[in-house]
Protein backbone atom coordinates (compact mmCIF):
# COMPACT_ATOMS: atom_id res chain seq x y z
CA UNK A 1 0.00 0.00 0.00
CA UNK A 2 1.32 3.47 -0.86
CA UNK A 3 0.08 5.34 2.20
CA UNK A 4 3.30 7.31 2.73
CA UNK A 5 3.41 8.49 -0.88
CA UNK A 6 -0.17 9.81 -0.85
CA UNK A 7 -0.95 11.50 2.48
CA UNK A 8 -4.72 11.87 2.38
CA UNK A 9 -4.77 14.04 5.50
CA UNK A 10 -2.55 16.68 3.89
CA UNK A 11 -4.74 16.70 0.80
CA UNK A 12 -7.81 17.09 2.99
CA UNK A 13 -6.23 20.01 4.88
CA UNK A 14 -5.34 21.68 1.60
CA UNK A 15 -8.97 21.34 0.52
CA UNK A 16 -10.18 22.84 3.79
CA UNK A 17 -7.84 25.79 3.39
CA UNK A 18 -9.02 26.35 -0.18
CA UNK A 19 -12.64 26.24 0.96
CA UNK A 20 -11.94 28.68 3.78
CA UNK A 21 -11.53 31.59 1.36
CA UNK A 22 -15.09 31.40 -0.06
CA UNK A 23 -16.42 30.85 3.46
CA UNK A 24 -14.55 33.94 4.62
CA UNK A 25 -15.94 35.91 1.67
CA UNK A 26 -19.50 34.86 2.56
CA UNK A 27 -18.97 35.87 6.18
CA UNK A 28 -17.55 39.22 5.03
CA UNK A 29 -20.59 39.80 2.83
CA UNK A 30 -22.89 38.93 5.73
CA UNK A 31 -20.94 41.26 8.00
CA UNK A 32 -21.41 44.12 5.55
CA UNK A 33 -25.18 43.54 5.41
CA UNK A 34 -25.86 43.00 9.11
CA UNK A 35 -25.98 46.12 11.26
CA UNK A 36 -25.10 44.18 14.42
CA UNK A 37 -22.09 42.58 12.76
CA UNK A 38 -21.06 45.88 11.25
CA UNK A 39 -21.39 47.92 14.46
CA UNK A 40 -20.07 45.45 17.03
CA UNK A 41 -17.79 43.05 15.12
CA UNK A 42 -16.36 44.98 12.15
CA UNK A 43 -16.11 48.63 13.19
CA UNK A 44 -14.18 48.41 16.51
CA UNK A 45 -11.27 46.30 15.17
CA UNK A 46 -11.17 48.37 11.98
CA UNK A 47 -10.97 51.66 13.90
CA UNK A 48 -8.30 50.20 16.22
CA UNK A 49 -6.30 48.93 13.24
CA UNK A 50 -6.61 52.31 11.51
CA UNK A 51 -5.54 54.16 14.66
CA UNK A 52 -2.48 51.89 15.20
CA UNK A 53 -1.50 52.04 11.53
CA UNK A 54 -1.79 55.83 11.31
CA UNK A 55 -0.04 56.34 14.65
CA UNK A 56 2.87 54.18 13.48
CA UNK A 57 3.11 56.00 10.15
CA UNK A 58 3.02 59.39 11.88
CA UNK A 59 5.80 58.41 14.29
CA UNK A 60 7.94 57.05 11.47
CA UNK A 61 7.54 60.35 9.59
CA UNK A 62 8.32 62.34 12.73
CA UNK A 63 4.88 63.81 13.56
CA UNK A 64 4.23 63.38 17.27
CA UNK A 65 1.15 65.21 18.53
CA UNK A 66 -1.20 64.77 15.58
CA UNK A 67 -4.79 63.79 16.20
CA UNK A 68 -5.96 60.85 14.13
CA UNK A 69 -9.43 61.07 12.65
CA UNK A 70 -11.46 57.87 12.71
CA UNK A 71 -12.45 56.23 9.44
CA UNK A 72 -15.92 56.90 8.09
CA UNK A 73 -18.45 54.14 8.69
CA UNK A 74 -18.35 52.64 5.19
CA UNK A 75 -14.56 52.49 5.02
CA UNK A 76 -14.38 51.10 8.55
CA UNK A 77 -17.00 48.45 7.73
CA UNK A 78 -15.04 47.45 4.61
CA UNK A 79 -11.74 47.31 6.50
CA UNK A 80 -13.37 45.41 9.38
CA UNK A 81 -14.88 42.89 6.98
CA UNK A 82 -11.47 42.40 5.35
CA UNK A 83 -9.85 41.95 8.77
CA UNK A 84 -12.57 39.47 9.73
CA UNK A 85 -12.05 37.50 6.52
CA UNK A 86 -8.29 37.38 7.00
CA UNK A 87 -8.74 36.34 10.63
CA UNK A 88 -11.04 33.50 9.58
CA UNK A 89 -8.54 32.26 6.99
CA UNK A 90 -5.75 32.54 9.57
CA UNK A 91 -7.74 30.62 12.21
CA UNK A 92 -8.64 27.86 9.73
CA UNK A 93 -5.01 27.58 8.61
CA UNK A 94 -3.84 27.52 12.22
CA UNK A 95 -6.44 24.88 13.05
CA UNK A 96 -5.20 22.76 10.15
CA UNK A 97 -1.64 23.10 11.43
CA UNK A 98 -2.69 22.07 14.94
CA UNK A 99 -4.61 19.08 13.58
CA UNK A 100 -1.64 18.02 11.45
CA UNK A 101 0.69 18.37 14.43
CA UNK A 102 -1.58 16.29 16.65
CA UNK A 103 -1.93 13.65 13.91
CA UNK A 104 1.85 13.46 13.50
CA UNK A 105 2.31 13.27 17.28
CA UNK A 106 -0.23 10.43 17.50
CA UNK A 107 1.55 8.55 14.69
CA UNK A 108 4.90 9.08 16.39
CA UNK A 109 3.50 7.95 19.74
CA UNK A 110 1.99 4.83 18.13
CA UNK A 111 5.31 3.95 16.48
CA UNK A 112 7.16 4.43 19.77
CA UNK A 113 4.66 2.18 21.57
CA UNK A 114 5.07 -0.50 18.87
CA UNK A 115 8.85 -0.25 19.17
CA UNK A 116 8.71 -0.49 22.96
CA UNK A 117 6.39 -3.48 22.71
CA UNK A 118 8.72 -5.26 20.26
CA UNK A 119 11.73 -4.52 22.49
CA UNK A 120 9.86 -5.94 25.50
CA UNK A 121 8.92 -9.01 23.48
CA UNK A 122 12.53 -9.51 22.39
CA UNK A 123 13.75 -9.12 25.98
CA UNK A 124 11.21 -11.71 27.14
CA UNK A 125 12.32 -14.12 24.40
CA UNK A 126 15.96 -13.52 25.32
CA UNK A 127 15.21 -14.32 28.96
CA UNK A 128 13.38 -17.50 27.97
CA UNK A 129 16.30 -18.55 25.73
CA UNK A 130 18.78 -17.89 28.53
CA UNK A 131 16.70 -20.04 30.88
CA UNK A 132 16.47 -22.80 28.27
CA UNK A 133 20.25 -22.61 27.73
CA UNK A 134 20.87 -22.92 31.46
CA UNK A 135 18.52 -25.90 31.66
CA UNK A 136 20.22 -27.63 28.72
CA UNK A 137 23.65 -26.88 30.18
CA UNK A 138 22.59 -28.46 33.49
CA UNK A 139 21.27 -31.52 31.65
CA UNK A 140 24.55 -31.88 29.71
CA UNK A 141 26.55 -31.67 32.96
CA UNK A 142 24.29 -34.31 34.50
CA UNK A 143 24.74 -36.64 31.50
CA UNK A 144 28.53 -36.12 31.61
CA UNK A 145 28.56 -36.87 35.36
CA UNK A 146 26.55 -40.04 34.79
CA UNK A 147 28.88 -41.11 31.97
CA UNK A 148 31.93 -40.60 34.15
CA UNK A 149 30.37 -42.53 37.03
CA UNK A 150 29.73 -45.64 34.91
CA UNK A 151 32.29 -48.40 35.25
CA UNK A 152 34.56 -48.74 32.30
CA UNK A 153 33.39 -51.38 29.86
CA UNK A 154 35.71 -54.37 29.48
CA UNK A 155 37.58 -54.27 26.28
CA UNK A 156 37.08 -57.24 24.00
CA UNK A 157 40.39 -58.16 22.54
Swiss-Prot record:
Gene Ontology cellular-component annotations: mitochondrion
Domain of life the protein comes from: Eukaryota
Record carries keyword Transcription regulation: no
Protein localization: Mitochondrion
Record's keyword terms, sorted: Coiled coil, Mitochondrion
Positions in coiled-coil regions: 103-129
Amino-acid biosynthesis as UniProt keyword: no
Any one Pfam family match given in the protein's UniProt record, by short name: OPA3
Main location: mitochondrion
GO biological process: locomotory behavior; musculoskeletal movement; regulation of buoyancy; regulation of lipid metabolic process
Function: May play some role in mitochondrial processes.
Family membership noted in the UniProt record: Belongs to the OPA3 family.
Full protein name: Optic atrophy 3 protein homolog
Source organism: Danio rerio
Organism lineage string: Eukaryota, Metazoa, Chordata, Craniata, Vertebrata
